[in-house]
Regions:
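Catalytic cores of nucleotide-sugar-dependent glycosyltransferases that transfer UDP/GDP/TDP-activated
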Residues: 1-141
Length: 141
């Protein structure tokens, strides 16, 4: 995000992949909310099935709060798991790509409950047109 600021580039879409980048939507919507370069940027997250199981450090929320991110936006991370990272990313994104063949039901329910534009593509080849349609009609609209 800091590199984008230094380049003075305002991206139309920021697409993040997997649990490793799942805090970026939160930071973009909360930490960088007053940054003019990101005012019109849309965030899409790709989620994958069969992720790592287990819990994350419970101090994670305190570390995020250090960046002055409000507690109510972190409720899903109170007892953080890798699945909860995805949930937080979805809640702070403008669209979701279901890229895994098998997806946890709670992820699918969350996208429906919050009316998130969703593209289910799995790992098939030749989905360029589907992405283009998704970006232009569902995300940038």
């Amino acid at each position: 995000m800091e590199t984008i600021k230094k380049l003075n580039w305002s991206p139309d879409i920021i697409h993040v992949h997997g649990w490793i980048a799942s805090l970026l939507p939160l930071y973009l919507k909360e930490y960088y909310k007053d940054e003019p370069l990101f005012n019109n940027s849309k965030v899409v997250v790709s989620v994958y099935g069969n992720e790592i199981s287990g819990n994350l450090d419970s101090k994670m929320v305190k570390k995020i709060q250090y960046d002055e991110i409000e507690s109510e936006t972190l409720q899903v991370l109170e007892k953080p798991t890798y699945l909860d990272l995805y949930k937080n990313a979805i809640l702070n994104s403008d669209g979701v790509v279901i890229a895994g063949e098998e997806m946890d039901e709670s992820i699918l329910n969350l996208t429906q409950t919050h009316n998130k534009p969703t593209l289910k593509c799995g790992f098939k080849e030749g989905f360029k047109k589907e992405y283009l349609d998704f970006y232009t009609t569902k995300i940038l609209n």
